[in-house]
From Swiss-Prot:
Name assigned to this protein: Polymerase acidic protein
Keywords recorded for this protein, A-Z: Cap snatching, Endonuclease, Eukaryotic host gene expression shutoff by virus, Eukaryotic host transcription shutoff by virus, Host cytoplasm, Host gene expression shutoff by virus, Host nucleus, Host-virus interaction, Hydrolase, Inhibition of host RNA polymerase II by virus, Manganese, Metal-binding, Nuclease, Phosphoprotein
Chief localisation class: host cell
Any one GO molecular function term: endonuclease activity
Family membership: Belongs to the influenza viruses PA family.
Native source species: Influenza A virus (strain A/Turkey/Minnesota/501/1978 H6N8)
Length: 716
């Protein structure tokens, strides 16, 4: 940007701008956007006055070629660009000779024909907003305001534009050229966004009584009174160097601001160790459903009835056996637990009337799996406060894990389309206002793109499981209730379908606090052989429970059916959020909406229809080692949704920390890409804060590896 300014503007203007910035303690090399803005403003002021004269008769005339004999007086006195002392001297002399009221702020020009001061504004925003800010700041009827924008708009006091059309057109053309030149060098966006509003001087108002006493009590250390603190704040130079600001604030701080260059950032260090394992509350891409179409059986909609009906669609059950044991668990107990579920479901069918819920017998295998009587006994603090060596358990540091390829596959799968629709197009009443019409149009387009997405299936599955588990936890606190894992969808032909993924058995659930844990055992059907990626299934015991006939291109093939069993736990607060997973749809819709808004503001009309219907256009989806991945607008919707859903499924403190800390580094890198010349201090500390969140969580590790791809491509 600095080079551009020096090439684009007359050397005299550049010199004046540098002088003005130095007077305010600003550096043209650092605040390059401000440098460009000051030069532009100076040039507009000079162009405003160029060629305008007043002849002997006091008439205003335009003379383009200089006639040395003519007795002409410049129509405008230029005040902008002079140093402050000189500028006020000129103003004082004008006011003394003409009797015009003296302005409070330094204006830019004086018009000898109209006998008024002029404030010139050049804005990258809306002219009327800038006009109001200027008017608010000067609060003077006498000073005439004239605002130009880079888009050719202008606004002046009482629509009196002072100059003829041709002179104003010259100024507008020049501003447009500057904008084009900046845009062609990739400088315009950053320049446009860097404009700040006019600072208005606040009127002082006195604080008295109680508020005054509170103010005096709440001062920072070393300040005796509010006045003394105010004086300090007012004297605080807002645009000095950061180092100076910091040392003004505290004697202990000494930060060196280092420039952040393309070569500065290094990739994030991902942990070494065994590959990370699956930790979601239910299976994702590996889940298998037993389904019934057009359910119309008696008691349809009662989970237990639906589950039994789904189980009856499968005929390939066989004697279960363990194919992948759980390293630390008592595996025969998992096997016995599954056999118990089968036996108790059989018992239900032999009863006259099927009950609505099923509580499992409290067998030794279930007590073990659900951690019954495993919690250490709670002792009243009064009884043990005299124990001399009372201490908290030592807990081990979590073991570091490396990124495994399965989590990227999980994410890719979540972005794919399934052959069923998982959400209904909500029928909402007629739109009354135009904005409602646009909103429902966007919602309908978005719903069409994501209703068949696998991430949407995960949402509905998550909502169902968490709702059922929270209900059972409150309604049957002491019981080991059997909870079917069910979802509902519609086929391509619009037929209703009920799916069973497996079962959950809930442990004792006296949940007083939000964070109290309820244990559960999950048993889920799958066709995935766990021996292919044993590290993914570290927390599971996997049984082979049947053979399933699958239709393929070469006819029917038989595949072993597996049951993934594990002990897990959740809490009231986690279940509450799980029940609200539909919010992910809203979050991703809002992200898409901001993309549409950006398009619409450029084109100055609503672009919703074009945005979704222009199938040829591709959009950036994300970074991969290959570069920036692009795809259709539908793919963008589904990717954003999948990210939001995974943030919910894999929510963790590691993710919270990583998201917050890596965002800071992301903003610095984006500032560098926008040529804003960012500076940093303690970059090492920021890396430390990010990397302490990279421990063993698969979703966080995947995000960190995406972040590294982004760094590589962003800094090329």
């Amino acid at each position: 940007m600095e080079d551009f300014v020096r090439q684009c503007f007359n050397p005299m203007i550049v010199e004046l701008a540098e002088k003005a910035m130095k007077e305010y303690g600003e550096d043209p090399k650092i605040e390059t956007n401000k440098f460009a803005a000051i030069c532009t403003h100076l040039e507009v002021c000079f162009m405003y006055s160029d060629f305008h004269f007043i002849d002997e008769r006091g008439e205003s005339i335009i003379v383009e070629s200089g006639d040395p004999n003519a007795l002409l007086k410049h129509r405008f006195e230029i005040i902008e660009g002079r140093d402050r002392t000189m500028a006020w001297t000129v103003i004082n002399s004008i006011c003394n000779t003409t009797g015009v009221e003296k302005p409070k702020f330094l204006p830019d020009l004086y018009d000898y024909k109209e006998n008024r001061f002029i404030e010139i504004g050049v804005t990258r925003r809306e002219v009327h907003i800038y006009y109001l800010e200027k008017a608010n700041k000067i609060k003077s009827e006498k000073t005439h305001i004239h605002i130009f924008s880079f888009t050719g708009e202008e606004m002046a006091t009482k629509a009196d534009y002072t100059l003829d059309d041709e002179s104003r057109a010259r100024i507008k053309t020049r501003l447009f050229t500057i904008r084009q030149e900046m845009a062609s060098r990739g400088l315009w966006d950053s320049f446009r966004q860097s404009e700040r509003g006019e600072e208005t001087i606040e009127e002082r108002f006195e604080i008295t009584g109680t508020m005054r006493r509170l103010a005096d009590q709440s001062l920072p250390p070393n300040f005796s009174s509010l006045e003394n603190f105010r004086a300090y704040v007012d004297g605080f130079e807002p645009n000095g160097c950061i180092e100076g600001k910091l040392s003004q604030m505290s004697k202990e701080v000494n930060a060196r601001i280092e420039p952040f260059l393309k070569t500065t950032p290094r990739p994030l260090r991902l942990p070494e160790g065994p590959p990370c394992s699956q930790r979601s509350k239910f299976l994702l891409m590996d889940a298998l459903k037993l389904s019934i179409e057009d359910p119309s059986h008696e008691g349809e909609g009662i989970p237990l009835y639906d589950a039994i009906k789904c189980m009856k669609t499968f005929f390939g059950w066989k004697e279960p056996n363990i194919v992948k044991p759980h390293e630390k668990g008592i595996n025969p107990n998992y096997l016995l637990a599954w056999k118990q579920v089968l036996a108790e479901l059989q018992d239900i069918e032999n009863e006259e009337k099927i009950p609505k819920t099923k509580n499992m017998k409290k067998t030794s295998q279930l007590k073990w799996a659900l951690g019954e009587n495993m919690a250490p006994e709670k002792v009243d603090f009064e009884d043990c406060k005299d124990v001399s060596d009372l201490k908290q358990y030592d807990s081990d540091e979590p073991e570091q894990r490396s990124l495994a390829s399965w989590i990227q596959s999980e994410f890719n799968k979540a972005c794919e389309l399934t052959d069923s629709s998982w959400i209904e197009l909500d029928e909402i009443g007629e739109d009354i206002a135009p904005i409602e019409h646009i909103a429902s149009m966007r919602r309908n387009y978005f719903t069409a793109e994501v209703s068949h997405c696998r991430a949407t299936e995960y949402i509905m599955k998550g909502v169902y499981i968490n709702t059922a588990l929270l209900n059972a936890s409150c309604a049957a606190m002491d019981d080991f209730q059997l909870i079917p894992m069910i979802s509902k969808c519609r086929t391509k032909e619009g037929r209703r379908k009920t799916n069973l993924y497996g079962f959950i058995i809930k442990g004792r659930s006296h949940l007083r606090n939000d964070t109290d844990v309820v244990n559960f055992v999950s048993m889920e059907f799958s066709l995935t052989d766990p021996r292919l990626e044993p590290h993914k299934w570290e927390k599971y015991c996997v049984l082979e429970i049947g053979d399933m006939l699958l239709r393929t291109a070469i006819g029917q093939v038989s595949r072993p059916m597996f049951l993934y069993v594990r002990t897990n736990g959740t809490s009231k607060i986690k279940m509450k959020w799980g029940m609200e997973m539909r919010r992910c749809l809203l979050q991703s819709l809002q992200q898409i909406e901001s993309m549409i808004e950006a398009e619409s503001s450029v084109k100055e009309k609503d672009m919703t229809k074009e945005f979704f219907e222009n199938k040829s256009e591709t959009w950036p989806i994300g970074e991969s080692p290959k570069g920036v991945e692009e795809g259709s607008i539908g793919k963008v919707c589904r990717t954003l949704l999948a990210k939001s859903v995974f943030n919910s499924l894999y929510a963790s403190p590691q993710l919270e920390g990583f998201s917050a800390e890596s965002r800071k580094l992301l903003l610095i890198v984006q500032a560098l890409r926008d040529n804003l010349e960012p500076g940093t201090f303690d970059l090492g500390g920021l890396y430390e804060a990010i990397e302490e969140c990279l421990i063993n969580d698969p979703w966080v590790l995947l995000n960190a590896s995406w972040f590294n791809s982004f760094l590589t491509h962003a800094l090329k």
